[in-house]
Amino acid sequence: MNTHRYLPMTEEDKKEMLATIGVDSIEALFADIPESTRFKSQLAIEAALKEPELIAHFQKLADENQSIKTYTSFLGAGVYEHYIPSIVDHVISRSEFYTAYTPYQPEISQGELQAIFEFQTMICELTGMDIANSSMYDGPTALAEAAMLSCGHTKKKTILVSKAVHPEARAVLKTNAYGQRLNVIEIDANANVTDIESLKAAYNDEVACVIVQHPNFYGSLEPLAEIEEIVHQGKAQFVVSSNPLALGVLKPPGDFGADIVVGDAQPFGIPVQFGGPHCGYFATTKKLMRKIPGRLVGQTVDEEGRRGFVLTLQAREQHIRREKATSNICSNQALNALAASVAMTALGKQGVKEMAKQNVQKSAYLKKQLSLAGIDVVGDGPTFNEFVINCGQPVKDVNRQLLEKGMIGGFDLGSVEPERNGQMLVCVTELRTKEELDLFANEMGALV
């Protein structure tokens, strides 16, 4: 007799289910699918492997990957290799936490709710905002949600977004806006920052929000004070997308009058991995508190006066208001938010500041070394941990040669902006050593 590790349902189960919905066969269930589009052949699946054989097979496939564990990486562009305290994996792997699901029953979820509350608190401290949610799927979806909130709040349909915002974030924004029949206008960038004159020309009373990234896609710092002055001429919302690590050394967007601050918490405790998952954050003002998307954890007291934590302001959410909900996020990135919380806690306020400072200092050092090697550094404004260089040839060719030297080169800007062909976005984090930076500069000098 054959043994089966997993039987989803028996033939009797299938008959009972079909009878319940009033059809007599699987074919009848899928009758609305045209015959011409149905797959009727046998799937070309190989014979089953024994578990040791299966492990060996996937290990062989995994060994074909080129990893940052064996290569020195200078690639960022939205996903960053940072130090992760060893305690992070220990805490998030505990059975009490090992889920991304929403803790609907606060009386049995105090530990998880407190951890989420601490995440919200730390995000507020970094951004200078009044309130933050429990997490979003990633930075781009958080940015899109900020735009949707702004349009709903102002009753306007025009969104101005800087071209210095990450192109993938802009793509997610456009996808969301299309379904809502909203108008997205992109503002030109000049010298790697938002062009102020272009913003002034595009701004009018029909604008719901202005979105910038700080530090932006090119690593440059935006003139937030100038931009805020333009945005708040009318009733538009000022939305800033920020790398939270950069806020360890930068003045928080809240101090510049931002109405909404979003971003990705990946730099804290979340490793570089293909396809994610990440952890978006969303912070705003008390004025917009009841319109914020996602779960909110609040602190309260029980009937005996003891401190406790609950999901609060749930009237915004789909399990309460259904189609009238202002938030349609269900299970979120709670596990990754916990990883970010543990990382920030382990580093401490001074540790976060020191980590951010090292990013600034090491990227500045590499900029100088590349210039000495004859490489053209594009733009002379302040940057965080990324900057643009001219390679004078296809970046993919340079990166191919760098890979042979054991290095992963920077992002090919020409792949998303044809007018930037030959330009590379270089990333330097605290993990890069002086020897690695010197070697990269020397190799680039020889290649370019």
From Swiss-Prot:
<dbReference type="InterPro" id="IPR015424">
    <property type="entry name" value="PyrdxlP-dep_Trfase"/>
</dbReference>
<dbReference type="InterPro" id="IPR015421">
    <property type="entry name" value="PyrdxlP-dep_Trfase_major"/>
</dbReference>
<dbReference type="InterPro" id="IPR023010">
    <property type="entry name" value="GcvPA"/>
</dbReference>
<dbReference type="GO" id="GO:0004375">
    <property type="term" value="F:glycine dehydrogenase (decarboxylating) activity"/>
</dbReference>
<comment type="function">
    <text>The glycine cleavage system catalyzes the degradation of glycine. The P protein binds the alpha-amino group of glycine through its pyridoxal phosphate cofactor; CO(2) is released and the remaining methylamine moiety is then transferred to the lipoamide cofactor of the H protein.</text>
</comment>
<comment type="similarity">
    <text>Belongs to the GcvP family. N-terminal subunit subfamily.</text>
</comment>
<dbReference type="InterPro" id="IPR015422">
    <property type="entry name" value="PyrdxlP-dep_Trfase_small"/>
</dbReference>
<comment type="subunit">
    <text>The glycine cleavage system is composed of four proteins: P, T, L and H. In this organism, the P 'protein' is a heterodimer of two subunits.</text>
</comment>
<dbReference type="InterPro" id="IPR020581">
    <property type="entry name" value="GDC_P"/>
</dbReference>
<dbReference type="GO" id="GO:0009116">
    <property type="term" value="P:nucleoside metabolic process"/>
</dbReference>
<dbReference type="InterPro" id="IPR049315">
    <property type="entry name" value="GDC-P_N"/>
</dbReference>
<keyword id="KW-0560">Oxidoreductase</keyword>
<dbReference type="Pfam" id="PF02347">
    <property type="entry name" value="GDC-P"/>
</dbReference>
<dbReference type="GO" id="GO:0019464">
    <property type="term" value="P:glycine decarboxylation via glycine cleavage system"/>
</dbReference>
<protein>
    <recommendedName>
        <fullName>Probable glycine dehydrogenase (decarboxylating) subunit 1</fullName>
        <ecNumber>1.4.4.2</ecNumber>
    </recommendedName>
</protein>
